[in-house]
A protein has these predicted regions:
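Transmembrane helix-boundary elements of multi-pass transport/secretion proteins
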Residues: 1-76, 83-86, 93-94, 179, ...
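Membrane-spanning alpha-helical segments of multipass transporters and channels
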Residues: 81-82, 90-215
Length: 215
């Protein structure tokens, strides 16, 4: 009913594009973030990387990932302009809230990638973690099957996926046209994802310094 009332043409691409495009972008961010850090460990260049950053893991991560952030955010701006400006998909609260949500998704996804490679500091395991988490996001975020109809455990687990919160912001902002204040729990959730690297950053630094990659 929500889809029909906010998509009177019953255009299926409105559903597909607004869910698959940000989901694929999120999956790419997971994979590229893990790969860019994991290759430093695999190629035994991690110590040199840290040395160039004055042995600061924070400077090292910022220097490596900020260019990615800019590129991914530009990609996000382009797909928002294309969907809402060119194709005229429903966007009842304007395009700016969706661009802000996209920036939050990009940052949250990058931080999740740091957590993935920090938890499993090998390239193959980190990429496996990233691909698995990213693919599951499509199923558990409420795109194809409503979360409220899932098992209560799965309903709770759905909150562990950034894409779920982006989807809820999309429903509130683009489809329903609510004020951004109504989506504050989802923005806060994405902010929490951005804070998660602080839990693994010291473990990641130890892996960069001491871990020996075994093919």
């Amino acid at each position: 009913m929500l889809f029909r009332s906010n998509n009177p043409w019953l255009n299926y691409s409105v559903y597909l594009c607004n869910t698959l495009v940000p989901g694929v972008l999120m999956l790419m961010i997971f994979m590229i973030t893990v790969y860019s850090i994991g290759t430093e460990i695999k190629d035994r260049t991690a110590r040199e990387w840290l040395r160039m950053s004055n042995n600061s893991i924070y400077i090292a991560l910022a220097g490596k990932l900020l260019p990615h952030t800019v590129i991914f955010f530009i990609m996000g701006i382009f797909y928002n302009i294309y969907l809402y400006g060119f194709l005229h998909f429903p966007c009842n609260s304007g395009i700016l809230p969706m661009i802000l949500a996209t920036l939050c998704l990009v940052l949250a996804s990058q931080c999740c990638g740091i957590v993935m490679i920090g938890t499993l500091p090998t390239l193959r395991l980190g990429l496996s973690f990233a691909s698995l988490w990213g693919v599951i996001s499509f199923s558990i975020s409420g795109f194809s099957f409503p979360v409220m109809a899932m098992h209560p455990v799965l309903q709770a687990l759905s909150n562990l996926f950034p894409l779920r919160h982006y989807f809820l912001i999309y429903v509130d902002q683009a489809l329903n046209g609510y004020s951004m204040i109504y989506s504050w729990p989802n923005y806060m959730a994405l902010l929490i994802f951005m804070m998660l690297p602080f839990l693994v950053v010291h473990r990641l630094k130890e892996a960069l310094v001491y871990y020996k990659y075994i093919p």
